[in-house]
Every structure is written in C-alpha cells, then in structure tokens.
C-alpha cells in the first residue's frame, strides 16, 4: 500500500469519511485521496514523493501559488508577536482599509473566519435590515453549509425549498426560494409570488460549485433591477471570485453593484478568513452599532490578517490578473484543441483565473441542468488518467479549476500535452 492509502485507512477510523471536508475524499471520482506533504509554487507533493501541477489551489485561495514568500514571512513575523488577542489590532484597520479600497462597493467590512460565516451573516443582516424573512438562491450554487443555504428547489418553480441535508428542519428551508441560474424569469416569478417577503438574493457571480458557469450578459444586471423593483438586497458571493476574476471581483468585471459582498479564500492568503461588507447604512445595522448580532472569537485574528494583507498587496500588483487570464485562456484553448483532435466533445468555460471542464455534446453550459447532463463517468476516467500524468484537477465534475500566477506557460503546455495523451486513450 502507498503512504496515502495507509493514512487514508487510519483517517477513516478517526475522522468521518477520513477527511475534514467531503470533496477531499475522492467520492466524486473514486479511489484514494492524495495525502499532501508540502506544496510550492504551482506544485503539490504527496507523501509518496510524487509531484503534481496543481489546479485546485486549496480550492481557490492560492492565486499567488503555494508557499509565497511574502505571505510566509508575514505569518512568521505576526506569530512572533502573538497568535490571538481577542482585542482590536492595527492590522484589522489596515486590512479593512485595503479591502474597501480594492472593492469600492464595500463602504464597511466585517471580518469573519470563513466563507460560510460571511454568507450566513450577510443573510442575517439583510433580513434584519429589510424586516423580511425569505431569501432567493440558485440551483447548483453553493454558499457554505448554513442551514438556510442547504436547500434545493421544490417540485415547482414557485414552491418553497426543501432541505437537501438531514439535520436541516423543513421549517428553516421554507424561507429559501431556489431559482434557476441565468434565468431571470424564474426570479421575477418568485418576487411576484412573494413581493413583500423576500429580503435578498444571494448569488455566485460566476457559479463555481457546479463546475464553472459564468453569467449570461443580462443575468446580473437583471438581478440588480429586480432587487431595486421589489425592495430586496442583492448579495454577491465573491468567496470564490473575489480578487480572482478581477481585482475588484466579478462585480467589477460584469459591471453590477451589490448591496452586500461576501469574501473568502484569497482574502486570507491560505489562512481561514472570510469577510462581508457593503453599503454603510446596511452595515450600520450590525452589532454593536445596530441590532443584528454577529460575533467571533478568532475574527480578525492577527495571523490571518497579516497573511491576508500580504496576499492582497501582491494580488493588487500590475499584471497579476492579465497573467491569470492569459494562462487560463491558453489552457482552455489547448484543452479544446486536444479534445477536438481526439474527437471528444468538450466544453471549457473560463473567466479570469477560473475554468471548468465539461464532457458534453452541448454547445454551451449555462445552468445546473446543462451541468447535470454532462458525462460524469468520462470525467472520472479523465481525472485519474491526468493524475497519473502528474496533473491534479479538482476531484469532482462539479468543482471549478483554479489558476495561479505561479503557473508557467511550460506548466500549461505540459498539462495540454498530458491531456492530449489522455484524450487519445479516453
């Protein structure tokens, strides 16, 4: 047995499923998950000594690549001063200044410890600010594991949501309406059914948890218009897209102004950080200045703030996003060319430093139904064959891939060459 197999066997006796987040268990592709010993730049190194070009990037945070010296040094320096104080620090102020400068729609920001904390807190704030209870989310979008968000659509377009996880009471789910991504008609129908009851829409501006599905041109502006028409808040969940699709996020890339923004992943530089913020009048409703409660023992802790501050300063440097886009575009085009040579139908969506690979005969993939129609079994075989070639993709047909500026054009070309060999056998 390999070291990964031995560790996985031991882990399953001690940790549910052997992992601390379900997708890591390789249940979406089968087989034994890799146990990682170290990472550097664009590469992961497993406990068996094998190296992989990494397109998971810790599920998004590693936009600069692994073990970036600026972030590593910032963490070391901060740790020498203490790990956590439970009191305000100068770095929290500097971090808030930087975030609000980089994302102009955020007048104020509150730091938390994860993307889930950011989205659940933003929704609570929206409910408290509007005095309404219902929310709209979209089928196939993921906003963390808060109870109100683990909800799937009911049997009809206007039915109330149903829990999609045991442990979520139906009474919680009934306040969540699930609409179709990229379908404004379904959103208008929900508003017309409940015109005075919907507090907010929460949306991934690029859906990254049904692989990678960008918005149609009219979708995000249409959501903004519907929120204005019916008096609801628009929450853009940029946990995945923030600082990756563009410096000011997908909201800037697509030209839409939210009321609240949720951030995570890149904002922590690899440390556990989330944030939410937006309009000053809305944020003023948050405790201690307002009645909507939110708190956290480790929120804004000095180690995480130092890592995030260092990361964002690097991400804000000229040329970073142009490089991400160039590398991702080359990868997408190369994969399509290689698939076409082998006669394999493929769609590759990409925007900024995100991409998604879909085995499908369809000309495009724009919604959850399109994603579910793709050939998942073929993706599973593709994943393992690419892994054998030394390329680490997300171990699920429903997760996006992530580029970093640490990837070289040689890494990209080697990945395309590997895919060409795999497609010939697939």
Swiss-Prot record:
It is found in: Cytoplasm. Pathway: Porphyrin-containing compound metabolism; protoporphyrin-IX biosynthesis; 5-aminolevulinate from L-glutamyl-tRNA(Glu): step 2/2. One of its GO terms (cellular component) is cytosol. CDD domains: OAT_like. Its EC number is 5.4.3.8. Induction: Induced by low extracellular levels of magnesium via the PhoQ/PhoP two-component regulatory system. The keyword Cytoplasm applies. Its cofactor is pyridoxal 5'-phosphate. Coiled coil: none annotated. InterPro entries: 4pyrrol_synth_GluAld_NH2Trfase (IPR004639), Aminotrans_3 (IPR005814), Aminotrans_3_PPA_site (IPR049704), PyrdxlP-dep_Trfase (IPR015424), PyrdxlP-dep_Trfase_major (IPR015421), PyrdxlP-dep_Trfase_small (IPR015422). Gene3D superfamilies: Aspartate Aminotransferase, domain 1, Type I PLP-dependent aspartate aminotransferase-like (Major domain). It catalyses: (S)-4-amino-5-oxopentanoate = 5-aminolevulinate. Keywords: Cytoplasm, Isomerase, Porphyrin biosynthesis, Pyridoxal phosphate. The modification N6-(pyridoxal phosphate)lysine is found at residue 265. Belongs to the class-III pyridoxal-phosphate-dependent aminotransferase family. HemL subfamily. HAMAP family: HemL_aminotrans_3. Homodimer. PANTHER family: GLUTAMATE-1-SEMIALDEHYDE 2,1-AMINOMUTASE, GLUTAMATE-1-SEMIALDEHYDE 2,1-AMINOMUTASE 1, CHLOROPLASTIC-RELATED. Aminomutase that catalyzes the transfer of the amine group on carbon 2 of glutamate 1-semialdehyde to the adjacent carbon 1 to form 5-aminolevulinate. This is Glutamate-1-semialdehyde 2,1-aminomutase. It comes from Escherichia coli (strain K12).
